[in-house]
Amino acid sequence: MNPSEMQRKAPPRRRRHRNRAPSSHKMNKMMMSEEQMKLPSTNKAEPLTWAQLNKLTQLATKCLENTKMTQTPESMLLAALMIVSTVSAGVPNSSEETVTIENGP
C-alpha cells in the first residue's frame, strides 16, 4: 500500500437536522376563529330523550340479532352509530322504527 491509500479518509459531513414544523407565527395565521369555522348550514339538534335512547338500544339489539353477532358494549355502540348515521343520511328504509327515532316518540 502506498502512503496515500493509508491516509484515513474523513467521515462524510452530516447534514444538520431541520425542524420541519411550521413556525408559531405561521400557525397563528392558520388558526381560524370559531365563527369562521361554522357553516351557515349547521343546524342545532334537540337533546335526545330517554325514550329515543331506549328505542335506539332496541334497534341496535335487533340489528345485532339479525347479523348474529354477540352483544358486547363495542358492538352495541357500533350498531347504534350505524343506525344514527343511516337515519341522519336520509337513507330510505321501510322500517317504522327508524322513523320513530327520527321524529321522536
UniProtKB/Swiss-Prot annotation:
Question: What name does UniProt use for this protein?
Answer: Endogenous retrovirus group K member 16 Rec protein
Q: Which residues form the signal peptide?
A: none
Tell whether Nucleus is among the UniProt keywords: yes
The encoding gene: ERVK-16
Listed under GO cellular component are:
cytoplasm; nucleolus
Function in brief: Retroviral replication requires the nuclear export and translation of unspliced, singly-spliced and multiply-spliced derivatives of the initial genomic transcript. Rec interacts with a highly structured RNA element (RcRE) present in the viral 3'LTR and recruits the cellular nuclear export machinery. This permits export to the cytoplasm of unspliced genomic or incompletely spliced subgenomic viral transcripts.
Give the compositionally biased regions (Basic residues).
10-20
Any single biological process term in GO = mRNA transport
Motif Nuclear localization signal residues?
A: 13-20
What else the UniProt entry mentions is:
Despite functional similarity, Rec shares almost no sequence homology with HIV-1 Rev and HTLV-1 Rex.
Source taxon at top rank? Eukaryota
Q: List the residue ranges of the region (Disordered).
A: 1-41
Q: Which residues form a coiled coil?
A: none
The listed locations are: Cytoplasm; Nucleus, Nucleolus
Organism this protein belongs to: Homo sapiens
Q: GO molecular-function annotation terms? A: RNA binding
Under the subunit heading, UniProt states: Forms homodimers, homotrimers, and homotetramers via a C-terminal domain. Associates with XPO1 and with ZNF145.
